[in-house]
Amino acid sequence: MSGGSTGERPFSDIITSVRYWIIHTITIPSLFVSGWLFISTGLAYDVFGTPRPNEYFTQDRQQVPLVNDRFSAKQELEDLTKGL
């Protein structure tokens, strides 16, 4: 079976075209800037529901929230999350 043409443009033709670079000189930096803003504004914490670095430990709870006994894990989790 010989290797036939699939009708697609060769990759070398794509990356040497002016249209490719006009499009990508806009999209690649804009993706970088939007990602940087997503992280630096703290929106990533809100979207994914993770606590901010200053919210891991409250004034009331300074210990690390670990579950020690797997058989009473539900009760331990309720005790740990009571103040949240």
Swiss-Prot record:
Topology within the bilayer: Single-pass membrane protein
GO biological process terms, semicolon-separated: photosynthetic electron transport chain
GO molecular function: electron transfer activity; heme binding; iron ion binding
Any one Gene Ontology cellular component term annotated for this protein: chloroplast thylakoid membrane
Transmembrane stretches, start-end: 22-36
Assigned protein family: Belongs to the PsbE/PsbF family.
Swiss-Prot/TrEMBL keywords: Chloroplast, Electron transport, Heme, Iron, Membrane, Metal-binding, Photosynthesis, Photosystem II, Plastid, Thylakoid, Transmembrane, Transmembrane helix, Transport
Known function: This b-type cytochrome is tightly associated with the reaction center of photosystem II (PSII). PSII is a light-driven water:plastoquinone oxidoreductase that uses light energy to abstract electrons from H(2)O, generating O(2) and a proton gradient subsequently used for ATP formation. It consists of a core antenna complex that captures photons, and an electron transfer chain that converts photonic excitation into a charge separation.
Protein name in UniProt: Cytochrome b559 subunit alpha
Main location: plastid
Coiled coil regions, renumbered to chain: none
InterPro entries in the record: PSII_cyt_b559_asu, PSII_cyt_b559_asu_sf, PSII_cyt_b559_CS, PSII_cyt_b559_N, PSII_cytb559_asu_lum
Cofactors named for this entry: heme b
Residues the entry annotates as binding heme: H24
Cofactor remark from the record: With its partner (PsbF) binds heme. PSII binds additional chlorophylls, carotenoids and specific lipids.
Subcellular localization(s) per the UniProt record: Plastid, Chloroplast thylakoid membrane
Subunit structure: Heterodimer of an alpha subunit and a beta subunit. PSII is composed of 1 copy each of membrane proteins PsbA, PsbB, PsbC, PsbD, PsbE, PsbF, PsbH, PsbI, PsbJ, PsbK, PsbL, PsbM, PsbT, PsbX, PsbY, PsbZ, Psb30/Ycf12, at least 3 peripheral proteins of the oxygen-evolving complex and a large number of cofactors. It forms dimeric complexes.
Organism, scientific name: Thalassiosira pseudonana (Marine diatom)
